[in-house]
Amino acid sequence: MFDEKDLIIDARHITRRFPAAGGKELTACNDINLQLYRGKTLGLVGESGCGKSTFMRFLVSLDKPTEGEILFNGKDITKLKGEELRLHRQHIQMVFQDPTNSFNPKMKIRDIICEPLLNFKKIRPSEKDAVARKYLEMVDLPGDFADRYPHNMSGGQRQRVAIARAIVLDPEVIIMDEATSALDVSVQKNIIELILKLQKEKNIAIGFICHDIGLVRSVAHQIAVMYLGNIVELMPAEDLPQKAGHPYTQALMKSVFDINMDFSKKIESIEGEVPSPLDVPPGCPFQNRCEYCREKCKTDRPLLKEIYPGHKVACHFCQQIGEMEK
């Protein structure tokens, strides 16, 4: 779907298991294969607890998978240690959901933005003020905000500072973990526009984690839908909503609120509860919530298969379901 020469991150067969009480294991990510490309956004969407943040933490080397490899420009970053790992971190940056908790409240905005540059000895301390003002203006904030503290700013302004800090090292990849979910809708729109502008200017690859599939559709070039640690659908963003093939993806789309929607139509929710990750049933992980579940779904785990160019679905009966939906 994308030019292979633009491939920057190739995550192969990523699995993460955590030990649990009673000798059990919790599988947070199960055999995940995803790629990030320069200048493109991969949206990773799913309900809370599905494993999307766990997966993205591997890309920024905050955790290591139990199995699998993550190739960054062809090099497996899961094997990096010490100084080699420290130097690698400048190439992949992260914007967290709550910038307040990722800032030192005693540091001025000038110091917050320039700390990464000082860590890698890319500027002198005397240059901090000019650099901070430059990057504040780059994220559409006044340069004199450099003298402020985080508590003197609104949530949207703090998130812009977080983005400025993320881009100050000119990274090739930025991971955004629910970076807009705590913001008002109007502020959210401005932040999204800023992200897209910076991506176009700097050709950055973005991993965008979100639980709102409607928002992801407006931001991403490619969308991966995750459920209970599994990728159940991987598709070009333009395939939503008409070509959504997995029942879970369809259910997520039906629950999206739209101001232009028919208000006589009920906003649907997904019936049932997510199974315990300590006791995942055999077969399809979505079986107990799927209205189309059949016997095969309870015994055989569906694998991702291509139904359209660049569009893969992990469902035994997605094509039949598509005909029924029509």
Specify the residue positions occupied by each region the protein language model found.
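Charged, flexible cofactor/metal-binding loops and thiol motifs
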Residues: 2, 25, 236-326
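Helix-to-loop junction immediately C-terminal to a conserved catalytic motif
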Residues: 60
